[in-house]
């Protein structure tokens, strides 16, 4: 099955950080961390799927598909990694160390108070938590990723220099050599 995903990446203190989400406890097929994506529906392109799934799986924290599309365009486009029929669309965003805290607290609050079947069926709580991972953390914690996704993690590790060059070139093109978080 052809699939598409988004993977936000930021630079903080000279290091790349990848934003991954962890499947909720009701996910039976493959537990663990991965990016934000899924299978193509109704003749969608992998990129259109990535935008839709990104909005759903991040519960709007980066906006809906149209907002994510604008964010990607504003930040220089995507670096694409293809693994079998799985299309990862990597893009730059500003590092926000609090994003996981706000996302995770919000989801924990709602998850504990709402009917789990309704939440699971809504597709709004596919990811129960998000975390920033450095490349070193990805190596150390690789077994915490979904089984199928561990091979994709290897591709990120193998292509780290190219990914970092892509992200840095997007910062230079935007004229923003330092993000707010990097100015500290």
Language-model features and meaning:
Residues 13-15, 25-27, 41, 93-99:
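Short, charged/polar surface micro-motifs in flexible loops or helix N-caps
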Residues 27-31, 98-184:
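Nudix hydrolase/Nudix homology domain
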Residues 28-36, 42, 79-81, 90, ...:
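Functional cleft and adjacent loop/helix regions within the main domain
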Residues 35-75, 89:
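The catalytic Nudix box helix
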Residues 63, 67-110, 114-115:
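Acidic, glycine-rich loop-and-strand cores that form catalytic or ligand-binding grooves
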Residues 1-36:
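N-terminal strand-loop-strand
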């Amino acid at each position: 099955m052809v699939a598409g995903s988004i993977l936000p990446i930021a630079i903080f203190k000279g290091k790349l950080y990848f934003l991954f989400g962890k499947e909720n406890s009701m996910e039976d097929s493959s537990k663990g961390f991965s990016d934000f994506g899924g299978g193509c529906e109704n003749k969608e392109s992998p990129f259109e799927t990535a935008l839709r799934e990104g909005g759903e799986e991040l519960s709007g924290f980066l906006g809906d598909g149209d907002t994510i599309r604008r964010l990607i365009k504003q930040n220089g486009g995507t670096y694409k990694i293809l693994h079998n029929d799985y299309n990862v669309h990597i893009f730059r965003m500003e590092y926000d160390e609090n994003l996981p805290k706000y996302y995770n607290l919000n989801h924990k609050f709602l998850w504990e108070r709402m009917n789990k079947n309704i939440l699971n069926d809504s597709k709004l709580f596919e990811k129960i938590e998000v975390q920033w991972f450095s490349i070193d953390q990805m190596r150390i914690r690789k077994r915490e990723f979904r089984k199928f996704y561990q091979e994709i993690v290897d591709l990120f590790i193998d292509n780290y220099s190219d990914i970092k060059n892509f992200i840095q070139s997007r910062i230079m093109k935007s004229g923003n050599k330092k993000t707010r978080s990097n100015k500290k």
